[in-house]
Each structure stands twice: as C-alpha cells, then as structure tokens.
UniProtKB/Swiss-Prot annotation:
Belongs to the bacterial ribosomal protein bL17 family. SUPFAM superfamilies: Prokaryotic ribosomal protein L17 (SSF64263). This is Large ribosomal subunit protein bL17. GO terms for biological process: translation. Disulfide bonds: none annotated. GO terms for cellular component: cytosolic large ribosomal subunit. GO terms for molecular function: structural constituent of ribosome. The gene is rplQ. Keywords: Ribonucleoprotein, Ribosomal protein. The keyword Ribonucleoprotein applies. Part of the 50S ribosomal subunit. Contacts protein L32.
Length: 132
C-alpha cells in the first residue's frame, strides 16, 4: 500500500536518486541557475531549501551537515560564505522554478531552477567619462 509516501522515484533506485540530487544541489549552489526536467526541479527544491536554511547559521556542526549532503567543499564554502548571508532575512522560498518548454528528444517538460535574488550578470556598457 502507498500510504503517506512522499517524493518521486524518477525511475531510479535510492542510491542513484541520492547521488543525482547531491550533484544537482552542488551545481545549483555553484552556478545559481541550472536547467533540468520539471519533476527533478520540483524534487530538487525539497533538497536545497533546507540546506540554505542551514547555512544561515555558520557553525562547525552546520558545515558538517551540509558537507554530508553536498560532498563538495567549494559548494559548502559558497553556501555558507555567500548564500547564507544573502538569505539571512528571507524566511524561505529561496528557489524559483521557471518552465521553459519541452526537450526535443522525448518532449519531457523542462525547467530552469534558479536562486532568487541572485545578482544579474554584469553587462558591458559603454559609459562615457567626462575628462576635465
């Protein structure tokens, strides 16, 4: 019976699913924007939001918990040094999921997963400086 079971299996066994979300979480922390299928994006939100909440309090114990879930030193470092401070006053909702059409090969619904309040890329603009 299927009582009170939450989460999607995504056609993978548990270890594959765990490794996939570990890799996707580390990529999202490092790049702040990734493209994936819509069901994976919705499940990734359940993984990454508690990690960002954990990063609001920078302690050795919290860093060890985050490292156990991400297993990427650079991602854990960025999580606590940048993202924890960026979202210190936000009470949740750190991830935005934007639908972006369907994949060409199998028509799977695709989505962008991005961190909200991420800094926009610096666009090179020609600014004239008045020389006096």
């Amino acid at each position: 019976m299927r009582h009170r079971l939450s989460g999607r299996q995504l056609g993978r066994n548990s270890s594959h699913r765990k490794a996939m979300f570990r890799n996707m979480s580390a990529s999202l922390v490092e790049h702040e924007l990734i493209k994936t299928t819509l069901p994976k994006a919705k499940e990734l939100r359940r993984v990454i939001e508690p990690l960002i909440t954990l990063a609001k309090v920078d302690s050795v114990a919290n860093r060890r918990l985050a490292n156990a879930r991400l297993q990427s030193k650079s991602a854990v470092g960025k999580l606590f040094s940048e993202l924890g401070k960026r979202y210190a006053t936000r009470p949740g909702g750190y991830v935005r999921i934007l639908k972006c059409g369907f994949r060409a090969g199998d028509k799977a619904p695709m989505a962008y997963v991005e961190l909200v309040d991420r800094p926009a890329r610096a666009v090179e603009t020609a600014v004239e400086v008045d020389a006096e």
